[in-house]
Structures are given as structure tokens and as C-alpha cells.
Amino acid sequence: MRYGIIGALDEEIALVKEQMTEVKEHKLYGRSFYTGRIGEKEIVLVCCGVGKVNAALFANAVIREFHAEAVINIGIAGAIGAGIGVMDVVLSTEAAFHDQDEVMVKYYPFRRSFQADPALLAFCLLYTSDAAD
């Protein structure tokens, strides 16, 4: 399985890139895409820029151009929940738009939330140091 990893900032993807072996750079859409491996896993890594539109565009690109079967969006984010600190790893089981008005409910294909893929979530849990918490 090939994994796409996207992050909004170069600083967010730097540690992932350092862990990769057999790295090759591909220039597409004005960005550098890096293919390689982390252990036995095939990785496609790109800095997508800030915002949900950029995230969607580059998630699409790693799927379409590099045939990624799963996409992981990494990086910093504002925290709403109590007990979440700086440098904590947060894995979502469900995600929702915070900036959509209720008027959107009547327009297809509106969805209030999106469920995380259970297999991908389980995979991510394997690589968090505090997964038991």
C-alpha cells in the first residue's frame, strides 16, 4: 500500500522526510513531491500549503498522480479540547467542517461529518508513542 502524507508547512513535513529512504523528488503543480520509503511502507510526501482547498487539491494529486491508497494530513492545529498540549498527537475518529453554516444542510452532497477509516486509524495508532492513553 502506498501512503500519501500531506502537510501545510515545510516544517511539518521535515521530520517525515528525514525518516524516508530512497527519496526521489518530483516537481508537479509548482510543488516538490517526495517518494520513498519509511521501513517497508511506500510514501508520497508533499507540502500542500495552508487551507482546506490546498489540502484537497494535493490529496487528490497524491492519489491521481502517485496512486496513494490512503492520505494522512499531518501538522499543527488549534486545539479545542481540554488536556491537549503542544506536540501532542491527535488522531481523529470523525472530522467536521467548523466553518459551514447550517444553510448548507439543504444542499447535496452536504455531510455534517466524515468518519475516519478504521483500518487507517488502527495503522496510525501503531506509530504513536502514547497509544495506550
Feature roles, as predicted:
Residues R2-F123:
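Metabolite-binding pocket within alpha/beta catalytic cores that recognizes anionic/polar moieties
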Residues Y127-D133:
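Conserved small/polar residues in nucleotide/adenosyl-binding loops
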